[in-house]
């Protein structure tokens, strides 16, 4: 939560933090790279306005004069002020959703990825305040230093490569010339599969990067169409 402040004041040259906490701290930093992932998916998370499922509140305007609890106090205050809705915003030290469940506050502003916990606690989302994701950020002086900037760019490349590899695997296989076209038609790829001629001119080696979740169906189909010696291997980076 405080990383953007350390980046801004030069304590750190480079760091990872969320868009939400950059906005909360109003930090003056350089955004080097958006990194779209969250705890359970490769999607952005959302900051949402949440009320009890049985509450009468249906929209953000219904919060006029109400009490809201959140960890994102400064952003929330500004958000409601910009909409000219008067609310009392208090800081939450944790267990934010429990406060609205127990009736300690009228609503909470909380971060969510899937919304499943909110539903499980018999709560309801009535408004989305913003989407957030991790960003690689740099101190402005560090970014303007050629040596440091080169190192920062290298780190960015490795992080992006790791993200692009998530959920993907590599596939290798051998295919005879007569089955090549049928097998190739089944293989998805980032661009096009790599095809190499084996020592026997009637056989080819195919290599491709595919979504891991699809291999359970893909591999049996490849075998049916004549692929042999199929190897599936994990990926660390795709650059």
Language-model features and meaning:
Residues 17-33, 37-43, 54-239:
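Small-molecule-sensing regulatory modules
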Residues 8-10, 103-104:
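Alpha-helix C-terminal capping segments
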Residues 1-6, 13-15:
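Extracytoplasmic small-molecule ligand-binding "clamshell" domains
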Residues 5-8, 112:
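Generic hydrophobic-segment detector
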Residues 46-47:
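Short glycine-rich loop/turn motifs
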């Amino acid at each position: 939560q405080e990383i953007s402040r350390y980046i801004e004041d030069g304590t750190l040259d480079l760091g990872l933090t969320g868009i939400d906490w950059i906005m909360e701290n109003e930090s003056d930093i350089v955004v080097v790279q958006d990194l779209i992932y969250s705890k359970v998916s490769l999607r952005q998370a959302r900051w949402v306005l949440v009320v009890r499922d049985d509450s009468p509140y249906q929209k953000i305007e219904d919060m006029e004069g109400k009490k809201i609890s959140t960890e994102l106090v400064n952003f929330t205050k500004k958000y409601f002020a910009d909409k000219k809705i008067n609310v009392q915003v208090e800081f939450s030290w944790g267990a934010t959703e429990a406060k609205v469940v127990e009736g300690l506050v009228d609503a909470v502003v909380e971060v969510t990825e899937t919304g499943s916990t909110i539903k499980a606690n018999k709560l309801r989302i009535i408004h989305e305040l913003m989407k957030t994701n991790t960003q690689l950020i740099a101190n402005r002086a560090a970014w303007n230093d050629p040596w440091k900037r080169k190192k920062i760019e290298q780190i960015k490349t490795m992080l992006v490569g790791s993200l692009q590899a998530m959920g993907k695997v590599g596939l290798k296989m051998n295919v005879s010339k007569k089955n090549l076209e049928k097998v190739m038609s089944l293989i998805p790829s980032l661009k096009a599969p790599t095809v190499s001629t084996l020592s026997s001119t009637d056989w080819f080696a195919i290599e491709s990067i595919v979504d891991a979740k699809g291999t359970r169906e893909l591999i049996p189909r490849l075998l049916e169409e004549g692929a042999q010696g199929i190897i599936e291997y994990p990926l660390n980076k795709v650059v």
